[in-house]
């Protein structure tokens, strides 16, 4: 079941799990979108947060070459992955469940951009019931140094130093030329993900988990996105962990992180249920 070319993992809740507050026929579905170079096992501890709450969890990480090369060159290579990922919900017949996205770094954020566009434009996918989104260490805006550091982390374990340095230099030059110097022109062909999502009007709540100590994603970019949503009166929460590094907030502060995620999930599902009930049974005066 599902697209065989899509390298995803799905975990269903234990039927005997006690104390679950959810409708047994509509348990929440949490979709984890990993960072560039992330492996499935790295997402396991995040998956456990939601699995222990009785949620269905889907884990997916876009290929690092699509994140760092294709998207940087202006090709919308992740759009098809986004569509296939959303179609999994219909394949597994869980399309009526409340959906929460948990998005990691710019790798997950790029994919999420296309997911949001499809949710607002596709005649079938726009019927999905998204209740909230959590961003971990995202988003960043044309941060060349941070992008080079992220790519270096991926290449360091599998590439010799000479090739790695050449690849990093070529990547930095490409990003500077296409996404900064020529961006006033190229944005009409492919608007960068940060600018596109700054105009996103999605009304479901969003939670931003970030840190001023993050060497890859600038806290200024995250706070600018938060401010943009709040100016539009869109429901937005945030927590600055202060000292944790990139996608390391859970490792440094496991209890606080888990508590924030689970309470946000419950609050989103509750508010969405109330909103749906109100729309189905409007009060007349």
UniProtKB/Swiss-Prot annotation:
Q: Name one GO cellular component term.
A: nuclear outer membrane
On whether Ribosomal protein is a keyword of this UniProt record, the answer is: no
User: Which ranges does the record mark as transmembrane?
Assistant: 165-185
User: Which superkingdom, per the lineage?
Assistant: Eukaryota
Keyword Lipid metabolism found: no
Main location class: nucleus
Q: Which GO terms describe its biological process?
A: negative regulation of BMP signaling pathway; negative regulation of ossification; negative regulation of osteoblast differentiation; regulation of nucleocytoplasmic transport
Record keywords, A-Z: Developmental protein, Membrane, Nucleus, Transmembrane, Transmembrane helix
InterPro entries xrefs: AB_hydrolase_fold, DUF829_TMEM53
How is the protein disposed in the membrane?
Answer: Single-pass membrane protein
One Pfam family this sequence matches: DUF829
Tell me where it resides.
Nucleus outer membrane
Q: What does this protein do?
A: Ensures normal bone formation, through the negative regulation of bone morphogenetic protein (BMP) signaling in osteoblast lineage cells by blocking cytoplasm-nucleus translocation of phosphorylated SMAD proteins.
Q: What family does this chain come from, according to its entry?
A: Belongs to the TMEM53 family.
Full protein name: Transmembrane protein 53-B
Gene of this entry: tmem53-b
């Amino acid at each position: 079941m599902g697209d065989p070319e899509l390298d995803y993992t799905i975990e269903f809740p234990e039927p005997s799990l006690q104390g679950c507050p959810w409708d047994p026929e509509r348990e929440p579905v949490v979709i984890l979108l990993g960072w560039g170079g992330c492996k499935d096992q790295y997402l396991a501890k995040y998956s456990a947060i939601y699995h222990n709450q009785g949620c269905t969890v889907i884990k997916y990480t876009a290929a690092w070459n699509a994140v760092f090369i294709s998207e940087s060159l202006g090709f919308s290579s992740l759009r098809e992955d986004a569509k296939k990922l959303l179609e999994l919900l219909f394949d597994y017949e869980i399309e009526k469940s409340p959906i929460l996205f948990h998005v990691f770094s710019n790798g997950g954020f790029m994919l999420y951009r296309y997911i949001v566009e499809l949710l607002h434009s596709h005649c079938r996918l726009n019927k999905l019931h998204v209740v909230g989104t959590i961003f971990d260490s995202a988003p960043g805006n044309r941060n060349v140094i941070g992008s080079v550091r992220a790519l270096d982390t991926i290449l360091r374990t599998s590439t010799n130093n000479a090739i790695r340095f050449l690849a990093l230099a070529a990547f930095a030059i490409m990003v500077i030329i296409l996404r900064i110097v020529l961006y006033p022109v190229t944005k009409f062909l492919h608007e960068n993900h940060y600018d596109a999502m700054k105009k996103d009007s999605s009304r479901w709540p969003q939670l931003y988990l970030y840190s001023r100590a993050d060497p890859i994603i600038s806290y200024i970019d995250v706070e600018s996105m938060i401010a943009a949503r709040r100016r539009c009166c869109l429901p937005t929460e945030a927590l600055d962990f202060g000292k944790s590094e990139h996608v390391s907030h859970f490792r440094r502060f496991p209890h606080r992180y888990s508590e924030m995620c689970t309470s946000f999930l419950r609050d989103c599902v509750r508010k969405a249920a109330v909103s749906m009930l109100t729309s189905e049974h409007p009060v007349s005066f």
